[in-house]
């Protein structure tokens, strides 16, 4: 049994956790069970335009949810497109967005990295209080670890928090976090944990996005 203070801490953590969804058919109805004030992140798919994310965000805007739309850098065409996106977000009074590089192999426009998009966001100006970026405790399938570390540190003056990639190993996450704190990372941390999903689908997704050793460990259990 956990001590009572651990139960309280776990309850607070779960109350502040957020659900990540894709802009798919029927998702609005499935989210109807969530209480007001629940955190919901809306992903940006490489197979759909960023407008699909914005459309779903607008459709959910009157539900009393705390919405966090994802704006993937490689899905934004140019500075003019970014300006339009920011205008839509400002009109909804969105309080937080998440800005990954994106899973698309080739950018559709001028932005190949999250940092480039964040820099233009800062120059254009916006009213979004919190901006999140991605972090990879287990590395990335196409980027070496030192480059990932340097990029995360370079982005932190343009962001307010980071979200770790899905990971199944608590010790690995905590060790990585301690190392990054020692290297100067001060942003608030949101830890990526696996949700309810079919085992094979979850493992396939994990390996595709770069979750390595901890996912392979799960396959043996």
Identify the role of each PLM range.
Residues 15-21, 38-42, 67-71, 97-99, ...:
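Hydrophobic faces of well-ordered beta-strands that scaffold small-molecule active sites
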Residues 37, 47-48:
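Long, contiguous binding/interaction regions
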Residues 10-11, 28-36, 54-66, 85-94, ...:
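Acidic (Asp/Glu)-rich catalytic clusters
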Residues 19-25, 110-136, 184-221:
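Active-site pocket-lining/capping segments in soluble small-molecule metabolic enzymes
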Residues 15-23, 42-47, 70-79, 132-146, ...:
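Active-site mouth loops of central-metabolism enzymes
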């Amino acid at each position: 049994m956990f001590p009572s203070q651990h139960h309280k801490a776990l309850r607070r953590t779960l109350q502040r956790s957020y659900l990540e969804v894709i802009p798919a058919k029927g998702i609005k109805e499935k989210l109807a069970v969530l209480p007001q004030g629940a955190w919901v992140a809306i992903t940006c798919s490489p197979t759909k335009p960023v407008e699909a994310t914005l459309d779903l965000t607008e459709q959910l805007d009157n539900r009393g949810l705390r919405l966090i739309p994802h704006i993937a850098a490689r899905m934004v065409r140019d500075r003019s497109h970014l300006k339009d996106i920011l205008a839509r977000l400002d009109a909804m009074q969105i309080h937080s967005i998440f800005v990954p590089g994106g899973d698309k192999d080739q950018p559709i426009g001028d932005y190949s990295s999250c940092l480039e998009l964040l820099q233009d966001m800062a120059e254009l100006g916006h009213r979004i209080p919190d901006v999140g970026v991605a972090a990879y405790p287990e590395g990335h399938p196409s980027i070496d670890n030192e480059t990932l570390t340097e990029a995360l540190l370079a982005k932190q003056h343009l962001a307010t928090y980071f979200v770790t990639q899905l990971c199944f190993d608590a010790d690995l996450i905590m060790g990585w976090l301690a190392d990054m704190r020692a290297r100067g990372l001060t942003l608030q941390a949101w830890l990526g944990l696996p949700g309810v999903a079919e085992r094979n689908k979850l493992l396939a997704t994990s390996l595709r996005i770069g979750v390595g050793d901890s996912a392979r460990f799960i396959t043996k259990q």
